[in-house]
Structures are given as structure tokens and as C-alpha cells.
Amino acid sequence: MEQEKKQPDVRLIGLDLDGTTLTSDKVLTPHTKEVLEKCLAEGIQVLPATGRVKSGIPEYLTQIEGMRYVILSNGASVLDLKEDKVLYQNCIPWERALELFDVLETYDTFYDIYALGAGWCEVRFYDNVENYGIEKHIEKLVRTSRNRIDDLREWMKENKAPVEKINMFFAKEEDRQRAFRELGKIEDLAVTCSLGNNLEINGATCNKGDAMLNLGKILDIPIESIMACGDGNNDFEMVKMAGVGVAMKNGEESLKEVADFVTKTNDEEGVAYAIEHFCNV
């Protein structure tokens, strides 16, 4: 029985990126890349399952041979990269997003959105990113993955685009905690975080676990053959539902409690270690 647990029939692996697959310096190590390549060569589907938008996914990941699928914006979108096709979506209606902007204005926060596969950020926030306590490597990601626009409300009215995710950054922790408490009470929203000073808003039923399950159904892969690795609050459902749920040693304690296995840290190639532990690669 113990041997059976160590070597399940893993056929689909969902990997969070920041704090999980990538090092703290946002690097994919050669060994981790090699392990992912071995999985894909063996017919195991490996995919990023991230809070990032499509334009924020590093090309060195998507260009790995055989890397076909990606889960974006905490599960709001599942893409088939090979066919350039959306397989599944679970977004916030644009009209509802407009209403939420009025609520967000009551907080001292930077906010922007993911929609149409890209990030959209008002100039007033984009030009002052450094004032919201954002780490340098995240600041760089924000600047390279967002489109600068003058008025988010007008953009929404013109494009009528479903919103994959709303991002918020806070300079003060007390402001973030207040927003987390208050926004968390709104029934049609799911409020999570992946960084020390951010909040991420999705529709209430949107999460990485739901997206993984739907991709599993599309690919005819049962839950028990799904493996998921993560470190943060926004990985909870994915790690909990997976047949093999893996939490990083550097991850949230609540995530470790629902995981089947706690691996090494992201700076110790914990993803590669976990995959080698459970898969014959």
C-alpha cells in the first residue's frame, strides 16, 4: 500500500509558478526544467497553473517541447497553447467589475485587471507602482505585463470584456487586512493572495482546483491521476482536490495541512524533488 502511494499513476501536473516552480529570483533551474521535459516526453501533461495573465508567462516555460496547456488568472482561463484556443473560462462579468471598481476606490490601493489575455492598468497606478510596497521583481513583472490606459471604466465600457482577475497591491498591511475582511464578505467573489502585500479577486467559483478538474475532464484524466504543487493561499483548492497534493516547505501552513506531501522549498528545487518522488522520471 505504501508503494502504491509513492508511485500513483500521475498523468497531469499543475504547477504554481511564483514561490513554487520558480526560485525567489524568478528562475527556472536547469534541473527543474529537465524534470519537466522528462515528464512531457513520457506523456505526462505538465502545465503552469498561475495567478498570472498570459502575457506574464515566461517564454522559457511555454516553449518547452510538449508544454501545451496553461491555467491563468487563478483558474479564470484554461488555454490550449498549441491550438491557441480557450478551453474553459470562469470570469467576472464586465458589468459586475465596473460596480466593484467603486468599492475598490474606498481603499488606499493600486488595482488593475486581467482581461482579453492581458493586463490593463491605469496610468495613475502604472506610473506610481513603487509607492505600493511592491518588490522589485514583481514591479518589473507588472510593468512588462500591463497595458497603460487612461480610464479603466471607459475601457471596460468600450470592450465589454469579461474580467479574469482583479489585482490589488497595498503599501500598508492594515489596509490590506481591512480589504481582505470586507471584500471577503461579498458572496459572488473569491478573495485570495499570493504575495505578502496583494489581494486577488476572482468570481466566487473560480479557483485553480476548479480549472484543473475541468481540464482533467477534457483530457479524460481522473482526479487521482492529477498532481498539483503550490505555496500560497490561491493554490489551496488545487492542492486539496488533487490526487497528489504537494505544498512547498516555504508555503502557507494552511496549505501544508491539506497537502499529501510537503516538499523542499522553491529555492531547493522542491517541484523537481516532488515529481521525482511520485513519478517514474
Name what the model sees in each region.
Residues 2-12, 28-29, 184, 199-281:
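Mg2+-dependent phosphoryl-transfer enzymes with acidic/Ser/Thr/Gly-rich catalytic loops
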Residues 9-25, 100:
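Asp-based phosphoryl-transfer active-site loop
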Residues 21, 75, 230-232:
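Active-site metal-binding loops of divalent metal-dependent hydrolases
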Residues 26-42, 89-96, 149-153, 205-217:
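Short, acidic loop-to-helix structural element flanking the phosphoryl-transfer center
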Residues 30-135:
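Active-site phosphate-binding/coordination module
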Residues 43-47, 66-68, 165, 224-225, ...:
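Short active-site oxyanion
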Residues 64-66, 74, 82, 186-187, ...:
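Short, structured coil segments at secondary-structure junctions
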Residues 107-109, 114-229, 233:
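Conserved acidic, metal-coordinating active-site core of Asp-based
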